[in-house]
From Swiss-Prot:
The protein's name: Sodium-dependent phosphate transport protein 2A
Transport recorded as keyword: yes
Alphabetized Pfam families for the sequence: Na_Pi_cotrans (PF02690)
Induction / repression: Up-regulated by low-phosphate diet.
Catalytic reaction list: 3 Na(+)(out) + phosphate(out) = 3 Na(+)(in) + phosphate(in)
A single Gene Ontology CC term: vesicle
Cytoplasmic-side segments: 1-103, 164-165, 369-410, 486-511, 560-637
Keyword check for Transmembrane helix: yes
Phosphothreonine modification, residue list: T506, T621
Residue(s) carrying Phosphoserine: S14, S34, S605, S623
Gene: Slc34a1
List of glycosylated residues: N298, N328
Entry's localization field: Apical cell membrane; Cell membrane
Function: Involved in actively transporting phosphate into cells via Na(+) cotransport in the renal brush border membrane. The cotransport has a Na(+):Pi stoichiometry of 3:1 and is electrogenic.
Lineage: Eukaryota, Metazoa, Chordata, Craniata, Vertebrata
Length: 637
């Protein structure tokens, strides 16, 4: 029988360690080859292990520290499949080419439906909560509080699922004199945070595979982390110094800015012919309620009568003004599904919400599957090229900024940062785009959506142009300031590290993604809003201890991972606390028991899944070909 080393084609390897020319006697142990080597040996196989336990052999003076390795079985699996496949015949090649050519228009069709479903989803949220959003904006006394204004911006943008809608309401209130520019800046910051919830929801659709879900959720939440970190720095700075207000005021005063054309509707030209057959909204009702026009309180958001030539002529004015201006023209009923149903806005909104979510999820799942099949043999080469396609050596640093330009340009074309970031989220999950590349693309997307707002502000009347343009510039300079804070130096790119940590946590506990959405975009903003309503004394009394505790925990976590020797021994880990205070494992057990309490247990196959985490590995049995001594605490295969 051939020995293991002879099957490798190399010299025999002693089962005992050798120091110099002398063999060290002691317990035998095996030298573990890499997965790539094992795949070349007939009759052997490897399992993907996300992390390896530390191996310490003190009796042989071979101490090994902690090892953290991540073996992705995809490269070797693809290589094996390519080697084992027979050479296809000409007819098979033609069939494969025809199938791939057929998948391209299908992918474009699913992408079109995906974008349309996002538009309908935004309309559904506006029908369900649009008037509530207008009422929130109406209370100017609340919005004068910067923290309350920030929370209002988050909640309203989450409600209407469109930062463009919330920003247009803010611009209308500022231009009408109901809201000062300084009070509107925190709301702009909040709308920047609220718009990132869409791609986070899209990432949930890839929860079936832990590795893909980890990458997709990290790529989606890097936008959230950037926005939250920017707000934590720039909101106190703005409240103390008025930085954005003064800078944008100087820019507006320095240039002779004149009104221009509306922002181009490049994407809506393609999507509106389909979405207008489903629903048409009169968004001026929300704006009118926000500016205090109670005459439209009982009007429906669903558009009934349309002008045959300019169906959107009344979007920038109230319904009463629109009817007055079009009194001498012919009006006709709008052509969409809900024009004659007589259903209330809330019912129509819930119907559209359910339908658009079903279409969105279906299109996304089919897009991911088709991308997988098209890129199956090229995913790894794409992943390698995505990390190596930098500019030549002296200009390597320009690559990220070029990605920002690409992200800004694409967002300007589609006129929606949510659409762009939601479109690249599945690619991040598949590994085609790395999170290091997705980060500058997302930052460029933030810039692209602000340029659209600037062009829209230039279409304002001359007497209202200054204030509306200043608000649009505040949005622009907020994102520019965030980029200067969190991108130029590699050590300052904290959003990437935070997003990766969230991705790992979510891949291990998939319910954590839903908890993250509820806490960050609903519960935490609502709690802060309620405390801010009690006055600044309550905010200081509650916020100061909480902020100090959060800063202490972050500092200790950094020292525990980087320099534990500088901490007292009892503080080098969190084990002195109850387990539920520093681990999600107890909560995960409760959720698992709650969800599976009525499920009938079924026998499971002993075969391991293709990708498993160390916490999920069953007790390992020694391999018959690589037998390890039972009394050694060696690495499990």
């Amino acid at each position: 029988m051939m020995s293991y080393s002879e099957r490798l084609g190399g010299p025999a390897v002693s089962p005992l360690p050798v120091r110099g020319r002398h063999m060290v006697h002691g317990a035998t142990f095996a030298y573990v080859p890499s997965p790539q080597v094992l795949h070349r040996i007939p009759g052997t196989s490897t399992y993907a292990i996300s992390s390896l336990s530390p191996v310490t052999l003190t009796e042989h003076s071979c101490p090994c520290g902690e090892v953290l390795e991540c073996h992705d079985p995809l490269p070797t699996k693809l290589a094996q499949e390519e080697e084992q496949k027979p050479e296809p015949r000409l007819s098979q090649k033609l069939a494969q080419v025809g199938t791939k050519l057929l998948k391209v228009p299908l992918m474009l069709a699913f992408l079109y439906l995906f974008v349309c479903s996002l538009d309908v989803l935004s309309s559904a949220f506006q029908l369900a909560g649009g008037k509530v959003a207008g009422d929130i904006f109406k209370d100017n006394a609340i919005l004068s509080n910067p923290v309350a204004g920030l929370v209002v911006g988050i909640l309203v943008t989450v409600l209407v699922q469109s930062s463009s809608t919330s920003t247009s309401i803010i611009v209308s209130m500022v231009s009408s004199g109901l809201l000062e520019v300084s009070s509107a800046i925190p709301i702009i910051m909040g709308s920047n945070i609220g718009t990132s919830v869409t791609n986070t929801i899209v990432a949930l659709m890839q929860a079936g595979d832990r590795t893909d879900f980890r990458r997709a959720f990290a790529g989606a939440t890097v936008h959230d982390c950037f926005n939250w970190l920017s707000v934590l720095v720039l909101l106190p700075l703005e409240a103390a110094t008025g930085y954005l207000h003064h800078v944008t005021g100087l820019v507006v005063a320095s240039f002779n800015i004149r009104g221009g054309r509306d922002a181009p509707d490049l994407l809506k030209v393609i999507t509106e012919p389909f979405t207008r057959l489903i629903i048409q909204l009169d968004k001026s009702v929300i704006t009118s309620i926000a500016v205090g026009d109670e005459s439209l309180r009982n009007h429906s958001l669903i558009r009934i009568w349309c002008h045959p030539d300019t169906t959107e002529a009344s979007t920038s004015m109230s319904r009463v003004e629109a009817i007055g201006s079009l009194a001498n023209t012919t009006m006709e009923k709008c052509n969409h599904i809900f024009v004659d149903t007589g259903l209330p806005d809330l019912a129509v909104g819930l119907i559209l919400l359910a339908g658009s979510l079903v279409v969105l999820c279906t299109c996304l799942i089919l897009l991911v599957k088709m991308l997988n099949s098209l890129l199956k043999g090229q995913v790894m080469s794409s992943r390698r090229s995505s990390t190596q396609t930098d500019f030549p050596a002296p200009f390597t640093w320009v690559t990220g900024y070029f990605a920002m330009v690409v992200g800004a340009s694409m967002t300007f074309v589609v006129q929606s940062s949510s659409v762009f970031t939601s479109a690249i989220t599945p690619l991040i999950g598949l590994g085609v785009i790395s999170i290091e590349r997705a980060y500058p693309l997302t930052l460029g997307s933030n810039i692209g959506t602000t340029t659209t707002a600037i062009l829209a502000a230039l279409a304002s009347p001359r007497e209202k142009l200054s204030s509306s343009f200043q608000i649009a510039l505040c949005h622009f300079f907020f994102n520019i300031s965030g980029i200067l804070l969190w991108y130029p130096l590699p050590c300052t790119r904290l959003p990437i590290r935070m997003a990766k940590a969230l991705g790992k946590r979510t891949a291990k506990y998939r319910w954590f993604a839903v908890l993250y959405l509820l806490v960050c975009f609903l519960l935490l903003p609502s709690l802060v809003f309620g405390i801010s309503m009690a006055g600044w004394q309550a905010m200081v009394g509650v916020g100061t201890p909480f902020g100090a505790l959060l800063a202490f925990v972050v500092l200790v976590n950094v020292l525990q991972s980087r320099s534990p020797g500088h901490l007292p021994k009892w503080l080098q880990t969190w084990d002195f606390l109850p387990r539920w205070m520093h681990s999600l494992q107890p909560l995960d057990g409760l959720i698992t028991r709650a969800t599976l309490c009525y499920a009938r247990p079924e026998p499971r196959s002993p075969q391991l899944p293709p990708r498993v985490f160390l916490e999920e590995l069953p007790p390992a049995t020694p391999s018959p070909r690589l037998a390890l001594p039972a009394h050694h605490n060696a690495t499990r295969l």
